[in-house]
Amino acid sequence: MLSSLLAGAGLVALAASHPTSHGNALTRRAVDINAFRLTATSEYVNATVAVSEPSLRFLKRADYLETATELVKSVAKDATFRVVEDHYVGSNGIAHVNFKQTANGLDIDNADFNINVAKDGSIFSYGNSFYTGAIPANPLQKRDFSDPVDALKAANDKLQLAVTAEKASAESTGAKETFTLKGTSGAVKDPEAKLVYLVKSDGNLALTWRVETDIMSNWLLTYVDAATNQEIHGVVDYSADATYQVYPWGLNDPTEGSRAVVTNPWDTTASEFTWQGTGTTTYNVPRGNNAIAQSNTDGGSDYLSNYRPTSTSQNFSYPYTLQMSPPSTYVDASVTQLFYTANVYHDLLHSLGFNERAGNFEVNNNGAGGSGNDMVILNTHDGSDTNNANFATPPDGQPGRMRMFLWDLSTPNRDSSFEAGVVIHEYTHGLSNRLTGGPANSNCLNALESGGMGEGWGDFMATAIRLKAGDTRAKDYTMGSWIANDPKGIRTYPYSTSLTTNPHKYTDVNNLRGVHPIGTVWATMLYEVMWNLIDRYGKNDGAKPTFGANGAPTDGKYLAMKLVVDGMALPNFVQARDAILDADVALTGGANKCDIWKGFAKRGLGSGARYSSTARTGSTALPSGC
């Protein structure tokens, strides 16, 4: 999925004093990709409801997969479905199983059932977006649907993609009704087409060709009506607009401290081959199991042959000052900084539960589960845009791609690879897209409110990481101030626990139409929750969390981050709030219930809050016992 650090076309613009994005390739072609966002219709049964439901107690089977399967059968009695092969047991002991609904042997691409099974084998919670309407006749008998090549041409025409498809031909991949489209140009790899159903915004089922095109600025799944090729029913973008002499971890940007030489900074549990190896190869360039970093001044899709510094002694120490210009004079330092920041964050997220089984980004998973061969491609000085950054998140087993652009709002221009908050924000898109819906399903955050939560998670994680030793809940933080050369930053308000400094509340979302403004509301709520937990447990100012016997971080900052990671799911604020509360039940037995509720309620997401896409109802009420 693709989300940006800044708003692109079709999104609400930021305040006039803040920088705006040049947009992505589709923006420049005047196609509003947001008009094609999928709608999100789902239910979520939280842990409190699940434990009180007598019928769920009888579903327990020998293992978590059988238990989850029985739940789907009991809830969706007439549905056909398949298990998505990305199930795993998280670091908190909760098993996660994902199911995909099928019809006539074809996937219903946006019909998912996500189940969490507790340590004792009981149903902990679940989310369900299965289609409940009538199933049409089997289209594979008459085969009166369009050709996949024609579907590619339709997507290319309607979205104004830069793909040449006149000589394209379809070759079967061997999977059911799935084709590689050969003979094209303009895409990073051969486009693919798969025949699937899609639940449309009106609730009806449509037979579509899901056409996958990676054109660098956008990595798209386009759902083209298979009957007519005249209508696009939805678009998912895997990319996300907006990562060892370095600014050390914890320094957000050059204004917060000086560069230093760090030695062997990796966590050997998360990066057992160090950052420079894959278990079979050791590199003398910024490349390893988790990432490969390079400059990309032409903005192209190639990266293996691009420039990156080489050191036979693995001493990546290069000069950089704020006065250096042009960027080519400090490219070695930029590549090194990006590689460092992305790797530290990889290791931290691994400790918080985003490991191999959960779908993280690694070449060699070393037998720990999940799909490998998917390190993050890190492009600094990317020439395809300015004043932004982005991250493309395909499903587990395919590399993520981060592109860091130069910002021209100061003289000399500033390099986004030197602002850790931007790198962390972008990498968090990879985290949230892999965790929400399962590692094999990266298109669950495409609706407006869920897309906003994706942006908010990125801002929250970046802000939590930059907290300093002397900070209290009175400390405010902006986002992107250095890179934008603007003390106000790139968001409407700073992150603050003061309702005067940042007045955002849940009902503000009713009047917001962009993922970034919506994300600011969500991150503000998470900031409140974090400070409630810090006030209770204190703050660990080290680079890594310390865990108690129950597997929970012992301090408030890392506990908040752990709960956010464990609770990443679901399409709207109310359900995501419940998921964080459920994550706390799984991790601590619900010890922090009231601290979490108070943080959300302060910002209008209390127990009486209700979701509606057009008329959200706010509430400052707390549940009984708080």
UniProtKB/Swiss-Prot annotation:
Write down the required cofactor(s): Zn(2+)
Region called Disordered, residue ranges:
606-626
Q: What induces it?
A: Expression is controlled by the prtT transcription factor.
Q: What is its EC number?
A: 3.4.24.-
Give me the stretches of Polar residues compositional bias. 610-626
One Pfam family in the UniProt entry: FTP
Cofactor details (free text)? Binds 1 zinc ion per subunit.
What the record says about family reads: Belongs to the peptidase M36 family.
Q: What is this protein called?
A: Extracellular metalloproteinase 1
Taxonomic classification: Eukaryota, Fungi, Dikarya, Ascomycota, Pezizomycotina
Gene encoding this polypeptide? MEP1
